[in-house]
Amino acid sequence: LDTCSGSWALLGNVVPRDSFVVSKLRSAGAVLFGKASLSEWADMRSNNYSEGYSGRGGQCRSAYNLTVNPGGSSSGSGVGVGANVIAFALGTETDGSGE
């Protein structure tokens, strides 16, 4: 899958292999539906910008209140599950998104 960490700098970057978790899911027959928005560079770019923002995807919003951001680096994963668009999602705990 293309992996850009929400940044234009990595556009077109393709990782050489699946992560351990993704390879286990595929082996078990899981179908991957896609990738979700995340804070640019997994929220490690700066402390002075809105969580859930990336140059590639723009500002991710809460599934229930469009005036707030969902917070955390894996914000798109949380929003997708919260909105019942997908049954489960994978995310990383980088800056509070797994709380």
Predicted features along the sequence, with ranges:
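Gly/Ser-rich catalytic/binding loops embedded in alpha/beta enzyme cores
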Residues: 1-95
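Conserved catalytic cores of soluble enzyme domains
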Residues: 99
